[in-house]
């Protein structure tokens, strides 16, 4: 347990940040899951719309440091490839 005043403050800040990041991470996963669900349903139009909504969220989370930029790029590339495969 934190003993000094500054350590207590850091512990509080850390917990607050953890909760905020957990919320953001959950939101990110929800957007990605919506795209995956539309792909599994075989609905190209819905998948494209869901991907268009998810793409800026993924980019924003990478910018904020919640996920690595390469992971964001990987998410977008794989989802986009699966959407394009629906048409072919």
UniProtKB/Swiss-Prot annotation:
**InterPro entries given for it?**
Ribosomal_bS20, Ribosomal_bS20_sf
Q: Where does the source fall among the domains of life?
A: Bacteria
Query: Does this entry carry the keyword RNA-binding?
Result: yes
Q: Which GO terms describe its biological process?
A: translation
GO MF terms held by the record: small ribosomal subunit rRNA binding; structural constituent of ribosome
Note whether Hydrolase occurs among the keywords.
no
Q: Cellular component GO terms, alphabetically?
A: cytosol; small ribosomal subunit
Keywords, comma-separated and alphabetical: Ribonucleoprotein, Ribosomal protein, RNA-binding, rRNA-binding
Q: From the record, what ranges are coiled-coil?
A: none
Q: Where is this region: Disordered?
A: 1-27
Query: PANTHER family of this UniProt entry?
Result: 30S RIBOSOMAL PROTEIN S20, SMALL RIBOSOMAL SUBUNIT PROTEIN BS20C
Please give the family membership noted in the entry. Answer: Belongs to the bacterial ribosomal protein bS20 family.
What does the UniProt function comment say about this protein? Binds directly to 16S ribosomal RNA.
Name this protein carries in UniProt: Small ribosomal subunit protein bS20
Which species?
Shewanella oneidensis (strain ATCC 700550 / JCM 31522 / CIP 106686 / LMG 19005 / NCIMB 14063 / MR-1)
Instruction: Tell me what gene encodes this.
Output: rpsT
């Amino acid at each position: 347990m934190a003993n000094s005043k500054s350590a207590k403050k850091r512990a509080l800040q850390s917990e607050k940040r953890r909760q905020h990041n957990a919320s953001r991470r959950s939101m990110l996963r929800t957007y990605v899951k919506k795209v995956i669900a539309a792909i599994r349903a075989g609905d190209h139009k819905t998948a494209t719309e869901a991907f268009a909504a998810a793409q800026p969220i993924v980019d924003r989370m990478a910018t904020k440091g919640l996920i690595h930029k390469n992971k964001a790029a990987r998410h977008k590339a794989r989802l986009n490839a699966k959407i394009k495969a629906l048409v072919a």
